[in-house]
From Swiss-Prot:
One BP annotation, GO: translation
A GO term, aspect molecular function: structural constituent of ribosome
Gene it is expressed from: rplL
UniProt name for this protein: Large ribosomal subunit protein bL12
Source species taxonomy: Bacteria, Pseudomonadati, Pseudomonadota, Alphaproteobacteria, Hyphomicrobiales
Family, per entry: Belongs to the bacterial ribosomal protein bL12 family.
Species whose genome carries this gene: Bartonella henselae (strain ATCC 49882 / DSM 28221 / CCUG 30454 / Houston 1) (Rochalimaea henselae)
Task of the protein: Forms part of the ribosomal stalk which helps the ribosome interact with GTP-bound translation factors. Is thus essential for accurate translation.
Length: 123
């Protein structure tokens, strides 16, 4: 065991350049590559379980923007609200416009509202 402790001590005292040279010498002597364990680690990391993709989104009106009239019109068209309700919703932002929407529907609503001048986010 004393020999192993001496080897560990000697290795600990190596400079980075000396350690790199030792690595190359050992690769040649044993016919292995130091890069192989890195590749295995990367593959193992990629095999980690993937988080489920979110399927339902809430479309949140963050801000009505400078063109509130256009945003109010778009909110009315998307939600079926009356003029006063749509105006109150836009002026009371941040407020949800649609909850539990599919990804495609949420993206469509977001793009329509942004085209009208609103700031929108999906949650």
């Amino acid at each position: 065991m004393a020999d192993l402790a001496k080897i560990v001590e000697d290795l600990s005292n190596l400079t980075v350049l000396e350690a790199a040279e030792l690595s190359k010498l050992l690769e040649e002597k044993w016919g292995v590559s130091a890069a192989a364990p890195v590749a295995v680690a990367a593959v193992a990391g990629a095999a980690a379980p993937v988080a489920e993709e979110k399927t339902e989104f809430d479309v949140i009106l963050v801000e009505g923007g400078a063109q509130k009239i256009n945003v109010i019109k778009e909110v009315r068209a998307l939600t079926g609200l009356g003029l006063k309700e749509a105006k109150d919703l836009v002026e009371g932002a941040p407020k949800p416009i649609k909850e539990g929407a599919s990804k495609d529907e949420a993206e469509k609503i977001k793009s329509q509202l942004e085209a009208a001048g609103a700031k929108v986010e999906l949650k």
